[in-house]
Amino acid sequence: MAFLSACTSWRHVHNAGFTFITKFPFVRNVHKLSYHISPLSSRFSLADISVKENNHPNGPQLRLQTHFFHSSSPMHATKGFRFPKSSTPLTLPAVLSVASFANLLQIPTRRILRDLNRLGIKDVFPEYLITYEYSSLLAEEYGFDVQEAAAYSAPSPKSLNSKKDSGPLRPPVVTLMGHVDHGKTTLLDAFRKSTIASTEHGGITQKIGAFTVPFDKGSKFITFLDTPGHMAFEAMRKRGANIADIVVLVVAGDDGVKPQTVEAIKHIQSADVPVVVALTKSDRPGTPIHKIYEQLLNNGIQVEALGGETQIIPISAKTGKGIPELEAAILTLAEIMEIRASPRDPFQGWIVESSVTKGVGSSATVVVKRGTVKKGMYLVAGKSWCKVRSLVDVNKKSIKQVLPGQAAQVYGWKDLPIAGDLAYEVKSESEAKRILSDIYRQSNEQNFYELAESQNEQRVSALAAKKSGPAAIQEETSVSKSFNIIAKCEDTGSMEALSDYLKPLQFGKVKSRVLYTGVGPVTETDIERAETSDAIIISFGVSVPKATFRLAEKHNVKLLFHNVIYHLMDDVRKLFALRLPPILVQRVTGEAIISAIFDIKAKRAVVHVAGCRVTNGTIEKSHKIRLVRNDKIIWSGEIDSLKHLKEEVTSIKKGRECGILLKNFDEIVTGDKLQTFVEEYKPPDF
């Protein structure tokens, strides 16, 4: 195609791989174009040409569209073949094989393979998967009118925050963020007058908790979100920042700004939400407050003490010091922001957490941003929909509705929604199903593109290996090992964090592969799937009955159960290391220093015997030995003779002296170090 405009530059990319650029003088009528196009026609076949006049502030401009092909090998010219004509537009899928594409267009497969080669796509074959980008290009060249189906666009997270709300003030949604073990959950205990922190596994938060707390004798409310501080839960912290109206950044006075604090600050800045800093453990003597001010400033947060706008409030959650001041700071900031929402608007909110409860089904913790959630409403979130069956507050009490700024547990989901999904109201079940159908189509198209790329690489690699013979195939299969994993978790947030940690595991060409993740207990199907695929099973936060452990043992399947993320990570790393090809290592068993050299007459020559003192371990005659000089290994071999005084011995322990005759080597000097060692295989350090 080509375009003629006032810039007088025409670029034509020939679809068979040929590119040229031609300068044209600016013309205002079609007749003058023939003078400039004629020279090209002698060298190329002109398939078609169309010229349109476009309106432009500087006067009408001509839009020139042409199809040129090499005259010696035109794209449209195939001897004895005519392209089919069709009056109806051709709808092409996101991905299809060359053979299917040829069958759909009723065009010989070999023709399409040749044209793909001319487009620069090499190593193609009938099973090769091509995307819509290339199939539509070829179809248009073959004379077909191609159309692409319009996809439904679901509301995005940005649409939730971009809308300017009206109506009464609503409770602010406040997220607590900070480094692990800096006191976030203990601070929430102080707000709720509860003891959450003492009941959490490993003393750390591993999912987002959401609940509404009354203040000023019930006249005001704040909805709090607690986020995990452990490094494995970055996605949860990012989600917490995106959902929040205000963030309370918790920094421990005795620890200062740490890695997860810095990461939390980046999420806060990315989400562009106001922040209040809570300085915990500030009642401890020697707290370097000014140093923490500087650390925060270096990461983009300027507190009021340094001339900025960010409040920093020293508190002690255990004694209650500073808690009223922190509450007042949050409520004052919320009043300044005028956070409003009408309960009469259509509902929109966030999925904070979701889980499956035995006997109850799928549920999700929802924070309402606008509108009201009531029983009987139809909701969509991500790839799931729900007819609200029941609503439960943080105290496990059934409620009739959830107002803006409040959080509650919503029951009735057909499938488990994913934490972080935008939830919104629809009018009916049929509308919910239609929306999900379009969402799945969009998702499948993206999956198809990824699948096409992956499968094409595998098929091309397999063909190359086949051409190279059995040795290449053996080599290819020997290095393509994977560490297969099936993971079951108590909720979607934990599942997300665990998947993010497991997927990047790699050492050399061995890498982890998460075959399946799900919410709920380990089932017999999971064990059978693990046995078939040589996978381990991880149960995180979901207790495993003894019968399930026995079943896994019967099927020779390794099953891990943990409530604490860092304990789980340690065990996964150990198991991953066992799947790696072992490496040969040398373990030193004894070490001696040469303090003197003795010349001994042998049968045909004089040999040098090392007079040594054993400084570490035991020198074993049967072990291999190496000579180290200036921290470099000079020689490695065997011991010919090991003597204590004049007696031949098999070993010499630390602290004793001996004479060592090396086999076929006597270039020794005083001060050299002799080390005996054994060679053994072990998993590589990971």
UniProtKB/Swiss-Prot annotation:
Region G2: start-end pairs: 203-207
Stored Pfam families: EF-G_D2 (PF22042), GTP_EFTU (PF00009), IF-2 (PF11987), IF2_N (PF04760)
Gene Ontology molecular function: any one: RNA binding
GO BP terms: mitochondrial translational initiation
Annotated compartments: Mitochondrion
Annotated region (G5), positions in chain: 316-318
GO cellular component assignments: cytoplasm; mitochondrial matrix; mitochondrion
Similarity remark: Belongs to the TRAFAC class translation factor GTPase superfamily. Classic translation factor GTPase family. IF-2 subfamily.
Protein name: Translation initiation factor IF-2, mitochondrial
Species annotation: Schizosaccharomyces pombe (strain 972 / ATCC 24843)
